[in-house]
């Protein structure tokens, strides 16, 4: 399935992932083919809307964004996805290792990014807009440094190590990166 629906405290959220064009370009020999991210996002959101009764739609993006609100921001894949697929409430951005201290708002869509290498955890709180639109607004967003003051979760750490080793063995070593 192209998406998953999770329910928490009576709120149903559909979540789906995207791989961006520039991310795919880093692995041209992988043999993987991806649709255009904007096209894939639009198709997935339409499918969610026709098949599910959800309160919000969240995109886990490996497309990327930039740190400032310059003209370059408007050219990033995540920004363009937010413009072209306005039904998405939240885009959690990755790939470019961007640290967004503040969320970027594009219409009713918010873009957040917590940097790279598990250095931070983003905490975003969405609340109903209360205007009858059924949309959500970002009421708070903060970055939590994952430093020595935050205890490791043994199960998460074990999974992370497992997937890093798998990526090194199965992919990166073939291209001299491990």
Predicted regions mapped to residue ranges:
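A short C-terminal boundary segment appended to hydrolase-like catalytic domains
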Residues: 128-178
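Acidic, metal/ion-coordinating pockets
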Residues: 1-149
């Amino acid at each position: 399935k192209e998406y998953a629906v999770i329910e928490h405290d009576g709120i149903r959220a559909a979540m789906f992932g995207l791989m961006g064009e520039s991310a795919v370009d880093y692995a041209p020999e992988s043999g993987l083919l991806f649709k255009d991210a904007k096209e894939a996002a639009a198709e997935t959101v339409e499918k969610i809307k026709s098949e599910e009764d959800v309160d919000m739609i969240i995109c886990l993006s490996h497309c990327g964004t930039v740190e400032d609100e310059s003209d370059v921001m408007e050219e990033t894949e995540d920004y363009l996805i937010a413009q072209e697929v306005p039904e998405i409430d939240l885009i959690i951005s990755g790939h470019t290792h961007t640290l967004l201290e503040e969320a970027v708002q594009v219409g009713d869509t918010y873009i957040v990014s917590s940097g790279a290498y598990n250095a931070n955890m983003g905490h975003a709180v969405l609340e109903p807009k209360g205007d009858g639109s059924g949309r959500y607004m970002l009421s708070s967003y903060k970055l939590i440094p994952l430093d020595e003051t935050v205890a490791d979760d043994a199960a998460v750490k074990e999974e992370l190590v497992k997937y890093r080793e798998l990526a090194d063995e199965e992919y990166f070593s073939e291209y001299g990166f491990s």
